[in-house]
Amino acid sequence: MHLLPELASHHAVSIPELLVSRDERQARQHAWLKRHPVPLVSFTVVAPGPIKDSEVTRRIFNHGVTALRALAAKQGWQIQEQAALVSASGPEGMLSIAAPARDLKLATIELEHNHPLGRLWDIDVLTPEGDILSRRDYSLPPRRCLLCEQSAAVCARGKTHQLTDLLNRMEALLNDVDACNVN
């Protein structure tokens, strides 16, 4: 289920392309849930800027896939099916996991908080009925910015930081994980 970094497109995505890609992902999720009546983990990489498919985002994605598989194994949860693809919005993974949706969401939140690359992952859990379990459902604060303690959404809207600073931070986190051989 890993993606080859050397095949990244480096295509700069427009806002309309990004919106279409998100709609297509939602349609894929609902079709997937019809085939697999268990919770669905839908996993993407948080990538600032217009280039969503790069060597860096694919490497971050691959670490996430490894971490999700390890989480399922540790918990004794069966992955019934899994798939990876690249859309206009970047690397995307889907895993049908036979586990209580609430437990799955809590475990993925912990993964996002505790893994060195967790801040760069967007892990959604959908119930078999198609409802997305949100961080707000667990009274958790919004995601934090990569560079400061503000809400990531506030910094993104206000364009508080230079794109190069955000991308450099992403790459530094990835290189640290690779150097320490963290999975």
Curated annotation (Swiss-Prot):
This is Apo-citrate lyase phosphoribosyl-dephospho-CoA transferase. It catalyses: apo-[citrate lyase ACP] + 2'-(5''-triphospho-alpha-D-ribosyl)-3'-dephospho-CoA = holo-[citrate lyase ACP] + diphosphate. One of its GO terms (molecular function) is holo-citrate lyase synthase activity. Pfam families: CitX. The lineage of its organism: Bacteria, Pseudomonadati, Pseudomonadota, Gammaproteobacteria, Enterobacterales. Keywords: Nucleotidyltransferase, Transferase. The gene is citX. GO terms for biological process: prosthetic group biosynthetic process. Coiled coil: none annotated.
